[in-house]
């Protein structure tokens, strides 16, 4: 009984640990991103975060390719979100303001959204058609 309980506890603790960040590249720039691929991870997003490292963000993988929407409830950081198609090509970038509950959507269908500190894409002149490399193969 104790062995089974100990094993269950170890499995639970192991699965609760944070996964390693993804190493991504876009237009010659390297970045790290947490990977939000489940509904719960996407719903939580970057809520409550007070800061992001300079070249760090969160990559959201959506279950289907379509126009996707984001909001900033309980998110104190100004962010830019880039939307990418199934092929990793950037299709849209939007800026998001802290704590704003207005729902903002991509203009075109996307599989992924990458949230970074606001202005990250503009400062690097990364726009539509840029390819995001390093996305995990599902």
Per-range role (PLM):
Residues 4-14:
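Bacterial N-terminal signal peptides
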Residues 19-138:
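Compact, glycine-rich, soluble single-domain proteins
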């Amino acid at each position: 009984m104790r062995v089974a309980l100990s094993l269950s506890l170890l499995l639970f603790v192991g699965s609760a640990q944070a996964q390693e960040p993804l190493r991504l590249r876009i237009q010659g720039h390297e970045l790290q991103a947490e990977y939000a691929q489940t509904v719960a991870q996407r719903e939580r997003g970057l809520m409550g975060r007070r800061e992001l490292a300079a070249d760090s963000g969160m990559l959201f993988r959506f279950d289907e390719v379509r126009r996707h929407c984001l909001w900033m409830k309980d998110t104190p950081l100004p962010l830019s979100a880039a939307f990418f198609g199934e092929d990793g090509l950037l299709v849209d970038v939007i800026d998001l303001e802290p704590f704003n509950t207005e729902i903002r959507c991509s203009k075109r269908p996307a599989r992924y959204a990458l949230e970074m500190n606001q202005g990250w894409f503009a400062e690097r002149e990364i726009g539509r058609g840029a390819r995001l490399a390093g996305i995990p193969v599902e």
